[in-house]
């Protein structure tokens, strides 16, 4: 039987096999296969049932345990969701508490957004990489590296899923979080900067931290404390983001609630976290990038091209697609050059089809400082993608004009941002002529 176990391990080393395929490969009977598998406790994970049964080999080469997966609901109650098993060669099998099983060739798509990334991800790596022997640059982390760090730290990631017993214990035993006042923000900003030694105010990424404000759980973006043309530009862009969100609110379009605060020499923009409900409640938050990777595979396409496919598949609601299209058109007409698939997300309390989350990261990023510190005050002509119809472009143009009007009247914008506002007006004037050609 030991020899048979070796044969099974070799057969499953390259990935799961159906029961019949495994039997044929080993040239044995069904009864012999069943007996052989029974002698391999703790090595095999069964996927599916009956004629659809497949078998996967647990991966003992990756330094990962069997991972308990928990989910927190909107009222703040935590419950087991299942167990995640690493299997050969690089995949995972999720065994839910109800017995359902799913094989993933890599990290399950619904966990991808939990990977540390961006400014906050680099700060996370700064804290945990040395003790775990991981690369200092979080961009070089494998899925295994990311999971190891989250399990060891008990990370509290975006969304409503927690991985491992450390995270579960942290959540259950945590006291009520303390509310932060605006006066605390400069200190929290300094801590955030010190945790990411690679950050520079020149470049297209805004530093941020998470906090509990008097209005609820927030993500807080901030500018550098030192006065400079670059920090002035970022101060203006925080105002621009606030005004874009206010413009959407004014039109009845869901967008993150925001608040501008000037404390000392710094400007802060509070943005509501819509994956948090009350003190402890949570809601699933899934990026377009994650959904595209699992269901479509066209990440370079504009948002509406991807969401149209997702709506057709029943992954998101038709309304989510329609609003995604409007937001993309609006972003195009206000110079938002950063509409990648990670900047659009979906929320859910009960699975598919997912609804679109409130809009976020919507601003005129065409005017953000370059990595070399150049301040741009021009914007490229708007490209009217064919995936959007004329009615959507016309609705977006009305919103975009309202946004520019708000900026032209906004006293918190610096004089140096005036050419940017004028450039947006010219962009919209040219776009209006082309939109008029659409039915």
Please annotate each region the language model reported.
Residues 1-6, 10-341, 345-439:
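Phosphate/dinucleotide-binding and metal-coordinating scaffold of catalytic cores
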């Amino acid at each position: 039987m030991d020899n048979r176990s070796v044969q099974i391990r070799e057969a499953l080393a390259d990935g799961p096999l159906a029961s019949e395929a495994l039997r044929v490969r080993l040239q044995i009977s069904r009864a012999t296969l069943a007996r052989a598998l029974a002698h391999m406790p703790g090595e095999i994970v069964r996927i599916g049932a009956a004629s659809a049964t497949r078998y996967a080999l647990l991966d003992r080469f990756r330094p990962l345990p069997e991972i308990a997966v928990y989910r927190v609901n909107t009222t703040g109650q935590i419950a087991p969701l299942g167990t995640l098993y690493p299997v050969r060669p690089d995949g995972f099998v999720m065994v839910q508490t109800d017995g359902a099983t799913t094989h993933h060739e890599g990290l399950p798509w619904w966990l991808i957004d939990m990977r540390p990334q961006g400014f906050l991800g680099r700060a996370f790596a700064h804290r945990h990489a040395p003790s775990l022997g991981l690369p200092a640059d979080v961009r070089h982390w494998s899925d295994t590296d990311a999971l190891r760090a989250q399990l060891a730290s008990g990370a509290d990631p975006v969304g409503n899923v927690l991985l491992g017993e450390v995270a579960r214990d942290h959540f259950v035993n945590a006291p009520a979080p303390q509310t932060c006042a605006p006066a605390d923000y400069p200190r929290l900003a300094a801590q955030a900067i010190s945790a990411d030694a690679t950050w520079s105010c020149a470049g297209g990424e805004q530093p941020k931290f998470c906090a509990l404000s008097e209005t609820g759980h927030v993500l807080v973006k901030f500018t550098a404390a030192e006065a400079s043309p670059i920090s002035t530009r970022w101060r203006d862009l925080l105002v621009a983001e606030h005004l874009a969100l206010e413009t959407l609110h004014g039109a009845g379009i869901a967008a993150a609630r925001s608040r501008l605060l000037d404390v000392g020499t710094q400007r802060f923009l509070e943005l509501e976290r819509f994956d948090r409900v009350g003190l402890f409640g949570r809601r699933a938050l899934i990026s377009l990038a994650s959904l595209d990777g699992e269901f479509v595979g066209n990440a370079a396409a504009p948002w509406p091209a991807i969401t149209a496919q997702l709506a057709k598949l029943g992954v998101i609601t038709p309304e989510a697609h329609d609003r995604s299209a409007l937001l993309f058109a609006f972003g195009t007409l206000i110079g938002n050059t950063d509409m990648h698939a990670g900047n659009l997300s979906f929320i859910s309390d009960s699975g598919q089809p997912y609804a679109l989350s409130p809009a976020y990261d919507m601003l005129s990023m065409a005017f953000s400082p370059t990595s070399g510190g150049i301040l741009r005050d021009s914007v490229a002509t708007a490209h009217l993608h064919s995936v959007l119809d004329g009615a959507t472009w016309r609705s977006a143009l009305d919103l975009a004009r309202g946004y520019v009007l708000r900026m032209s009247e906004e006293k918190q914008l610096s004089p140096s941002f005036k050419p940017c506002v004028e450039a947006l007006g010219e962009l919209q004037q040219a776009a209006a002529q082309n939109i008029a050609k659409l039915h």
